[in-house]
């Protein structure tokens, strides 16, 4: 049975089994032609998606909006707390209940971990977590996996390095959890000691017997990996600007570093300067393809959740 059809909401990638992920990736592949042609279908005609974004977002918000419209639906939403009654003191719960009355599904982004789960417990429509603090970002993980499979033909048997802020980066937390579902995957975590992968993520990998190695520099692993997944070092996490500049400068990927190598480079974006622009026109650059892949993948997610609500049909 496909577990995704039992889920009312998508809150954490930990709720997925491999077959659920494979189902979404297959659905995304079928919908990619619609995404590329920039045409629309009628899969979700008459449906409305509520976008509740309490934290800044460009790609996630726009790709969800694009995905819904490509499926024939429409969107309503807020982009920050200033644009809704939360700024007047209204509770998140009341705002969510109001959105529930107007929408067939909700997409939530919030700076606090756990808000999406809280909202999913008080509304009857599907809820999609679009990032909660330093917690999870499950739909980003699905499009990351889609990109890897599309570019390399598989996810099994790959060596993948996650680089940058692994402590606070929710994308790498979710991605690590998901990669643990695949066979013979080896993970390399490249980060300064202040920003290493949280122990709870490492604990989950240990339980699944997923091999991983923690290193301090990109140079230690660059000859070993198939995928380099780069994230920005977050300036706001450092009290000392000099320390930030020192660490940031040690985690920059450029064209010269990758000469003669077949590694693909991914990034959830936005980038600051951790990937040099001289990489943009090389075979290594997959981060712009990755950004586009958000549309077919999120189309697949929306179609799966909304079209099957409220009966949640099961597929054997």
Swiss-Prot record:
Database matches in Gene3D superfamilies: Aspartate/ornithine carbamoyltransferase (3.40.50.1370)
Sites binding carbamoyl phosphate sit at: 59-60, 109, 137, 140, 269-270
- Known pathway: Pyrimidine metabolism; UMP biosynthesis via de novo pathway; (S)-dihydroorotate from bicarbonate: step 2/3
Which InterPro entries does this chain map to?
Asp/Orn_carbamoyltranf_P-bd, Asp/Orn_carbamoylTrfase, Asp/Orn_carbamoylTrfase_sf, Asp_carbamoyltransf, Asp_carbamoyltransf_Asp/Orn-bd
Q: Which GO terms describe its molecular function?
A: amino acid binding; aspartate carbamoyltransferase activity
Any idea which UniProt keywords this protein has?
Answer: Pyrimidine biosynthesis, Transferase
Instruction: Look at the named UniProt entry and state the broad enzyme category this protein falls under.
Output: transferase
- EC annotation? 2.1.3.2
Q: Which residues bind L-aspartate?
A: 88, 170, 232
> What reactions does this protein catalyze?
carbamoyl phosphate + L-aspartate = N-carbamoyl-L-aspartate + phosphate + H(+)
GO biological process entries? 'de novo' pyrimidine nucleobase biosynthetic process; 'de novo' UMP biosynthetic process; amino acid metabolic process
Q: Does the keyword Transferase apply?
A: yes
Q: Which family does it belong to?
A: Belongs to the aspartate/ornithine carbamoyltransferase superfamily. ATCase family.
Name the job this protein performs: Catalyzes the condensation of carbamoyl phosphate and aspartate to form carbamoyl aspartate and inorganic phosphate, the committed step in the de novo pyrimidine nucleotide biosynthesis pathway.
Q: How does it assemble?
A: Heterooligomer of catalytic and regulatory chains.
- Name of the protein this chain belongs to: Aspartate carbamoyltransferase catalytic subunit
Organism field: Methanobrevibacter smithii (strain ATCC 35061 / DSM 861 / OCM 144 / PS)
């Amino acid at each position: 049975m496909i577990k995704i059809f039992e889920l009312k909401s998508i809150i954490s990638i930990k709720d997925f089994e491999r077959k659920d992920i494979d189902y979404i990736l297959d659905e995304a592949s079928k919908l990619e032609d619609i995404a590329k042609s920039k045409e629309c279908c009628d899969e979700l005609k008459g449906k409305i998606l509520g976008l509740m974004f309490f934290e800044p977002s460009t790609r996630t918000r726009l790709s969800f909006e694009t995905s819904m419209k490509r499926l024939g639906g429409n969107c309503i939403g807020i982009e920050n707390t200033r644009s809704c009654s939360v700024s007047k003191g209204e509770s998140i719960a009341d705002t969510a209940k109001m959105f529930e009355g107007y929408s067939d599904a909700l997409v939530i982004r919030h700076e606090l971990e756990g808000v999406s789960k809280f909202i999913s417990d008080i509304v009857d429509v599907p809820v999609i977590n679009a990032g909660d603090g330093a917690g999870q970002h499950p739909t980003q993980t699905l499009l990351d996996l889609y990109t890897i499979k599309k570019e390399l033909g598989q996810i099994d048997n790959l060596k993948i390095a996650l680089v940058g802020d692994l402590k606070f980066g929710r994308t790498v937390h979710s991605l690590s959890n998901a990669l643990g579902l695949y066979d013979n995957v080896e993970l390399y975590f490249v980060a300064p000691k202040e920003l290493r992968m949280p122990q709870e993520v490492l604990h989950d990998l240990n339980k699944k017997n997923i091999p991983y190695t923690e290193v301090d520099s990109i140079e230690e692993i660059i000859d070993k990996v198939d995928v380099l997944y780069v994230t920005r070092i977050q300036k706001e996490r450092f009290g000392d600007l000099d320390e930030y500049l020192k660490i940031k400068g040690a985690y920059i990927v450029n064209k010269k570093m990758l000469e003669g190598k077949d590694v693909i480079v991914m990034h959830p974006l936005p980038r600051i300067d951790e990937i040099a622009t001289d990489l943009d026109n090389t075979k290594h650059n997959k981060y712009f393809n990755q950004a586009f892949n958000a549309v077919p993948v999120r189309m697949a997610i929306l179609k799966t959740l909304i079209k099957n609500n409220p009966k949640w049909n099961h597929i054997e």
